[in-house]
C-alpha cells in the first residue's frame, strides 16, 4: 500500500496562488489530494465541464474547481498579510503545530 506525501497545507487553510492564471488570488482549501500532489481551492482554477443529458436531466455546462499543484500555493498569514513559509514546532505537551516563519503566528490551534 502506497501512502501519499505529507503536504504543507491542510483542509480549511487560507492559501494564495503564487503562479499561473489565478496568481495573487486567495481561497480556502476544500480538499487535499496527496497522490496527485494537488489541492482544490474554493473559487480558484475554475473549469467548464460539459455534461450529457441523462434521463430527465438536461445537458449543461457546469463550472467547478480543478486541482492545482501544491507547489503553486502558499499559506496566507492573516497577521503578516502575506504568503508565508511554515515551520513545525513541538509544544510542551508534545503537540506539533505549524508556525509562520516571519511572525511566529500558529496556524494549528
UniProtKB/Swiss-Prot annotation:
CC annotations in GO: ribonucleoprotein complex; ribosome
Transmembrane helix among keywords: no
Gene Ontology MF term list: rRNA binding; structural constituent of ribosome
Pfam families (alphabetical): KOW, ribosomal_L24
GO process annotations (BP): translation
Keyword flag NAD: no
Keywords: Ribonucleoprotein, Ribosomal protein, RNA-binding, rRNA-binding
TM spans (from-to): none
Domain of life: Bacteria
Family: Belongs to the universal ribosomal protein uL24 family.
Role according to the record: One of two assembly initiator proteins, it binds directly to the 5'-end of the 23S rRNA, where it nucleates assembly of the 50S subunit. One of the proteins that surrounds the polypeptide exit tunnel on the outside of the subunit.
Subunit structure, interactors included: Part of the 50S ribosomal subunit.
Protein name: Large ribosomal subunit protein uL24
Species, as recorded: Geotalea uraniireducens (strain Rf4) (Geobacter uraniireducens)
Gene from which the chain derives: rplX
